């Protein structure tokens, strides 16, 4: 007897991935704490936890892609869930960046006597904002224009053009990451060099980490577009990647103005 479904929602099958992801996260957290406190076996537990967590992420997302692309379970009602989740995730990321910019502004607007009452602290070298930082700043907004091009191509049903646009986006992202690496290689200060080094490298490094995650996200979208997974009505994964990438490229303007330029001169 064939069961009929009188609603537009997807009732997922039982899955082992939530519990395996929880165990991987637990092992990663405990292993990280043990490693930082030089406990024996901490590095091993941390490595195993990360491997287990990454494997769980891969197979869980694989199942989601199978359910949406091959089995057709992601109706319009189901697609609202990932969209709302992506928006809330980006909002939480905004709060994280706000925290780091607040720390930098708090330290630079009222420098304490421990750092000489000046900003940047006396004896701390800073990067010239008009060299690599200025060169790197317009690259991410340019990649944002490329990902918008890809979005319009998907909506127009032009698959090859969407692939070309995603390739352009990824290439610009890789160039940006390369420039970020050059910045850190040439940086005259480290994360342990006073509050300036801590806030500078934490804020810019956190943003650089988001660029890497967004690049991986877009690479997967590019592969899926090449395989014909994304259509006019079913491209929620790409939309989430595009929203995330626009967030990343806009955020780049804030550290340049507040940390590289104003906070470093």
From Swiss-Prot:
Catalytic activity: 4 Fe(II)-[cytochrome c] + O2 + 8 H(+)(in) = 4 Fe(III)-[cytochrome c] + 2 H2O + 4 H(+)(out)
Membrane topology label: Multi-pass membrane protein
This protein's GO CC annotations: mitochondrial inner membrane; mitochondrion
Transmembrane segments: 16-36, 41-61, 84-104, 162-182, 200-220, 242-262
CDD domains documented for this protein: Cyt_c_Oxidase_III
Superkingdom classification of source: Eukaryota
Pfam (any one): COX3
Subcellular location: Mitochondrion inner membrane
Group of enzyme by EC: translocase
EC number: 7.1.1.9
Ion transport found in the keyword field: no
A GO BP annotation: mitochondrial electron transport, cytochrome c to oxygen
Protein task: Component of the cytochrome c oxidase, the last enzyme in the mitochondrial electron transport chain which drives oxidative phosphorylation. The respiratory chain contains 3 multisubunit complexes succinate dehydrogenase (complex II, CII), ubiquinol-cytochrome c oxidoreductase (cytochrome b-c1 complex, complex III, CIII) and cytochrome c oxidase (complex IV, CIV), that cooperate to transfer electrons derived from NADH and succinate to molecular oxygen, creating an electrochemical gradient over the inner membrane that drives transmembrane transport and the ATP synthase.
Sequence similarity: Belongs to the cytochrome c oxidase subunit 3 family.
Complex and partners: Component of the cytochrome c oxidase (complex IV, CIV), a multisubunit enzyme composed of a catalytic core of 3 subunits and several supernumerary subunits. The complex exists as a monomer or a dimer and forms supercomplexes (SCs) in the inner mitochondrial membrane with ubiquinol-cytochrome c oxidoreductase (cytochrome b-c1 complex, complex III, CIII).
Protein name per UniProt: Cytochrome c oxidase subunit 3
Organism per entry: Zea mays (Maize)
Taxonomic path: Eukaryota, Viridiplantae, Streptophyta, Embryophyta, Tracheophyta
């Amino acid at each position: 007897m064939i069961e009929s479904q009188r609603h537009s929602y997807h009732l997922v099958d039982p899955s082992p991935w939530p519990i395996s992801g929880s165990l991987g996260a637990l092992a990663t957290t405990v292993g990280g704490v043990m490693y930082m406190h030089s406990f024996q076996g901490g590095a091993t537990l941390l490595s195993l936890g990360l491997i287990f967590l990454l494997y769980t992420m891969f197979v869980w997302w694989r199942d989601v892609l199978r359910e949406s692309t091959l089995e057709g379970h992601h109706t319009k009602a189901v697609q609202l869930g990932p969209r709302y989740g992506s928006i809330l995730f980006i909002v939480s990321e905004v709060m994280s960046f706000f925290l780091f910019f607040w720390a930098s502004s708090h330290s630079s607007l009222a420098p304490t006597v421990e750092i000489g009452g000046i900003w940047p602290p006396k004896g701390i070298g800073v990067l010239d904002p008009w060299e690599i930082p200025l060169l790197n700043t317009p690259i991410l907004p340019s990649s944002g224009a490329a990902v918008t091009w890809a979005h319009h191509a998907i909506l127009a049903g032009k698959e090859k053009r969407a692939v070309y646009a995603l390739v352009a986006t990824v290439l610009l992202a890789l160039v940006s990451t390369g420039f970020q690496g050059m910045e850190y290689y040439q940086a005259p200060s480290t994360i342990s060099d006073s509050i300036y080094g801590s806030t500078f490298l934490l804020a810019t490094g956190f943003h650089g980490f988001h660029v890497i995650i967004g690049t991986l996200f877009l690479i997967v979208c590019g592969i899926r577009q090449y395989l014909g997974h994304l259509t006019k009505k079913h491209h929620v994964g790409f939309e989430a990647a595009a929203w995330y990438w626009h967030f990343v490229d806009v955020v780049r303007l804030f550290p340049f103005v507040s940390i590289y330029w104003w906070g470093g001169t």
